[in-house]
Structures are given as structure tokens and as C-alpha cells.
């Protein structure tokens, strides 16, 4: 498979402008891909048209054309016709629900496996894993299944952080992922911090950015992964 998938933890890092830190990661994928389709289904409160314009503005320096999948009469054909696919962040459950609703999971996976570049951030990265069972957001809608694209043979946890507000008594992210690995000890999870990304090119997987990621599987909990590490053994 000639997969080229860039899975960004977030659309921002710190107080930087929207998508600014992602440009060096995305730019190489646009050299031979000028016409992109954007999937805004995770952006509920923002609205699809507003979300599309926000992405166009954030990526304006890349000299590419971006259409919204919601603008096309045939969403599946829009995926086939595009040179590349963007999938934005927001609510992961709603995103996956709509992908099932419009029967898009298979065609996206088919096109990406054939070499079409895929760029997701936040929820758009979540769905690149085996399922959305390690997402952070609220299940506001029930998709037919939690099974996702499977561009990576493990689970993702974008926006990974260990921060806990003083006086807050809820679970930490590590505790939530521990619970997942207790229920499913055979499936790995990689938590990626804001500002970092995973990039798969064929049989090679790399952690991009200057921050550690964290690996969880069975009894292995929060094992650090060095920035820039080769993670190809996970494929």
C-alpha cells in the first residue's frame, strides 16, 4: 500500500495562528496535489461553510484549491476526483456518523491506499486509527460503529496531555487510556501531543515535531516515544 497519511494532533500549538504550525508538515504533500477536498463534518457549532473558509485561510500560503465535501452533490465522487483529502477536527462521533451516513469510509480508505494524500487533525486523526474508542470528546451522536478508517493498525489519542487542573478530580488522560488497555490489552495506543504528528508513508511511520509521544499497550503504560522516532514496527 502506498499510503501517505499525515495525522496531526491539533490545528494549533499554543497561541499560534490556525494551522500555522502544520504548514511545514503539509507542504510536501501538496507538491503534486493541487485540488483538495475538505471534510468538515466534525465542525458542528462552527458550520461547514465557515469551517471551510477558516481552513482555506489557514492554508492560503500552500497555493492549493480546497473545496468542501458538503458542496458536492456526490460526496463519494468528490473523494475520487480530489488530489488529496483534508479532514478537520471537532466532534469525532459526529464526524464518523456522517462518514457512515454518506458511505464514505470505504472510498476514503480505497483512495488513500492507492496513494492519495490524507491529512487529518484532531478528530480527523482519530478516525485514521482502528476505531474511535480512545477519543477525548463527548458522544453526542451514535455512529453505526466505532470502527474507523484503519490507516494505522492501532489507536490514536490526539491532544495528549497529563495536565490536570488544580482541584479537579476527574481521570487523567493516562488513567482513561489505562482503562482502554485493560479492556483491550492487545491493541496499542499512541498519544500525540499538540504540535506533533504521525506521518505514514508506505511501510514507514515517523513521529514529527519536537515533542514526545506516549505508547500504551497491556501492562506497558505511558512509555515515552522520542521526538522524530521511527515507529515503523507498529505497522
Swiss-Prot record:
Which Pfam families does this one have? Answer: Peptidase_S51
Q: Which GO terms describe its biological process?
A: proteolysis
First-level EC class: hydrolase
InterPro entries per the record? Class_I_gatase-like, Peptidase_S51, Peptidase_S51_dipeptidase-E
According to the UniProt entry, what is the EC number of this protein? 3.4.13.21
Source taxon at top rank: Bacteria
Subcellular location(s) of the protein: Cytoplasm
Task: State the reactions this protein catalyses.
Answer: Dipeptidase E catalyzes the hydrolysis of dipeptides Asp-|-Xaa. It does not act on peptides with N-terminal Glu, Asn or Gln, nor does it cleave isoaspartyl peptides
Q: Does the keyword Protease apply?
A: yes
List the GO molecular function terms.
Answer: dipeptidase activity; serine-type peptidase activity
One GO cellular component from the entry?
cytoplasm
Keywords annotated in UniProt: Cytoplasm, Dipeptidase, Hydrolase, Protease, Serine protease
Residues of the active site are 122 (charge relay system), 137 (charge relay system), 159 (charge relay system)
* Function summary: Hydrolyzes dipeptides containing N-terminal aspartate residues. May play a role in allowing the cell to use peptide aspartate to spare carbon otherwise required for the synthesis of the aspartate family of amino acids.
* Family indicated by similarity: Belongs to the peptidase S51 family.
Put simply, this protein is called: Peptidase E
User: Which species is listed as the source?
Assistant: Shewanella amazonensis (strain ATCC BAA-1098 / SB2B)
Amino acid at each position: 500500500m502506498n499510503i501517505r497519511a499525515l495525522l496531526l494532533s491539533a490545528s494549533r500549538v499554543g497561541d499560534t495562528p490556525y494551522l500555522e504550525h502544520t504548514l511545514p508538515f503539509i507542504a510536501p504533500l501538496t507538491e503534486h496535489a493541487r485540488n483538495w477536498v475538505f471534510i468538515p463534518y466534525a465542525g458542528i457549532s462552527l458550520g461547514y461553510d465557515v469551517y471551510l473558509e477558516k481552513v482555506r485561510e489557514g492554508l492560503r500560503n500552500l497555493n492549493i484549491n480546497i473545496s468542501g465535501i458538503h458542496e458536492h452533490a456526490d460526496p463519494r465522487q468528490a473523494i475520487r476526483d480530489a488530489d488529496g483529502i483534508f479532514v478537520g477536527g471537532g466532534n469525532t462521533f459526529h464526524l464518523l456518523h456522517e462518514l457512515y451516513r454518506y458511505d464514505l469510509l470505504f472510498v476514503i480508505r480505497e483512495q488513500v491506499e492507492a496513494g492519495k494524500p490524507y491529512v487529518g487533525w484532531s478528530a480527523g486523526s482519530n478516525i485514521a486509527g482502528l476505531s474511535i474508542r480512545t477519543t477525548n470528546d463527548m458522544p453526542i451522536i451514535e455512529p453505526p460503529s466505532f470502527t474507523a478508517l484503519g490507516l494505522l493498525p492501532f489507536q490514536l489519542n490526539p491532544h495528549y496531555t497529563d495536565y490536570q487542573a488544580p482541584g479537579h478530580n476527574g481521570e487523567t488522560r493516562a488513567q482513561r487510556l489505562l482503562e482502554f488497555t485493560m479492556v483491550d490489552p492487545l491493541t496499542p495506543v499512541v498519544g500525540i501531543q499538540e504540535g506533533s504528528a504521525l506521518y505514514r508513508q508506505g511501510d514507514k511511520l515517523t513521529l514529527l515535531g519536537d515533542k514526545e509521544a506516549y505508547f500504551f499497550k497491556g501492562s506497558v503504560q505511558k512509555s515515552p516515544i522520542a521526538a522524530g522516532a521511527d515507529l515503523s514496527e507498529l505497522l
